[in-house]
Amino acid sequence: MFGQWEFDVSPTGGIAVASTEVEHFAGSQHEVDTAEVPSAAWGWSRIDHRTWHIVGLCIFGFLLAMLRGNHVGHVEDWFLITFAAVVLFVLARDLWGRRRGWIR
C-alpha cells in the first residue's frame, strides 16, 4: 500500500520537512524584493508622504466644508470640528516629526 509513495529521507534518518530558518532579504530594510512585488522596480512600492499630506489637507477641508449644511443642531458641527482638528493634529505631528528626523 505505501510502496507507491516516495519519501525524502534526511541524513538523520527522519523525513525531511520544511526549514524553520527565516530567509533575510539582502537589501536595506526599506526596499521591497522585486521577486515578490514586480512593480517595486519602478518605484511604485514607496510611500509618497507628500501625497498623503495633500490628501489629509483635502479631508480637513472637506470636513470643514460640511459645516455648511441643512442641519439644525450643532452636535454635528462639534463632531466635524473635532474630527477636522484630529486630522490636522496628525498631519502637523507627521510633518514636524519628519522634519526633525523622528519619523522616516
UniProtKB/Swiss-Prot annotation:
Regarding the membrane, this protein is recorded as:
Multi-pass membrane protein
Q: Where is it predominantly found?
A: membrane
* Record Pfam families: DUF2631 (PF10939)
Give TM regions.
47-67, 72-92
Provide this UniProt record's keywords sorted from A to Z: Cell membrane, Membrane, Transmembrane, Transmembrane helix
What GO cellular component is one of the record's annotations?
plasma membrane
**Cellular localisation:** Cell membrane
Family assignment? To M.leprae ML1584.
Question: Any idea what this protein is called?
Answer: Uncharacterized protein MT2944.1
Species this chain originates from: Mycobacterium tuberculosis (strain CDC 1551 / Oshkosh)
